[in-house]
């Protein structure tokens, strides 16, 4: 007889916590959120306080630990308790944004750039996993969809800064996000490579329409 990796004490507790949270805080409010076309930010904070936003992310970056099986348990429990696919995608949009930032922070640490790594971790990654900020991934564009080879968004160096020009569309959490991971081309990347920039949505020139 083999052990079921999905049925450990810890994962049963995670499933119960997730199902209870969903039944109390998400499922009863879905129709109201649909009518308002917005999920309150307080729900993100509550998920962060419960440790659910951090499942699958290492504790040293502000996560709750766990692996892909824990993420699967979380997802199945949340949807099984009545959350819609749209609510799940919106509440966990960081799942397609934060991994890129963690990778960048790790690379900066290896390169000896502790300032850059600390900025990514302390100003972006940890606040998102705590539910204090909302993150989104900006790839899809109005004309070319998600064809990254033909991205029209460009990032041009300007002294110590970068100027980004372009438009994104159909971005999950796009109207609520505090930070974007934006896919661009740069003068050095060419069309075969994509450069990702962490962009604070409060910066001048950033608009949501």
Regions found by a protein language model. Give the residues of each.
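A short, Trp-centered hydrophobic/proline-enriched beta-strand micro-motif
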Residues: 131-139
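Cytochrome P450 C-terminal beta-domain/meander region
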Residues: 147-165
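A non-catalytic, amphipathic alpha-helix used as a structural packing/dimerization or gating element
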Residues: 10-24
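Intrinsic disorder at enzyme termini
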Residues: 1-12, 155
């Amino acid at each position: 007889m083999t052990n079921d990796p999905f049925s450990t004490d810890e994962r049963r507790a995670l499933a119960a916590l997730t199902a209870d949270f969903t039944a109390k805080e998400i499922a009863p409010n879905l129709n109201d959120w649909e009518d308002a076309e917005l999920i309150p930010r307080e729900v993100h904070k509550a998920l962060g306080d419960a440790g659910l936003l951090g499942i699958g992310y290492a504790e040293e970056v502000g996560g709750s630990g766990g692996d892909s099986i824990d993420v699967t348990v979380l997802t199945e429990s949340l949807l099984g308790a009545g959350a819609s696919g749209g609510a799940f995608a919106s509440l966990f949009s960081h799942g397609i944004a934060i991994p890129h930032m963690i990778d960048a922070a790790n690379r900066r640490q290896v390169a000896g750039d502790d300032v850059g790594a600390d900025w990514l971790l302390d100003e972006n990654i940890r606040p998102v996993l705590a539910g204090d900020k909302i993150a989104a991934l900006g790839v899809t564009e109005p004309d070319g969809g998600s064809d990254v080879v033909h991205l029209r968004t460009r990032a041009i160096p300007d002294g110590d800064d970068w100027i980004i020009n372009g438009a994104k569309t159909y971005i999950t959490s796009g109207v609520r996000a505090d930070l974007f991971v934006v896919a661009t081309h740069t003068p050095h990347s060419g069309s075969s490579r994509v450069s990702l920039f962490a962009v604070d949505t409060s910066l001048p020139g950033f608009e949501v329409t």
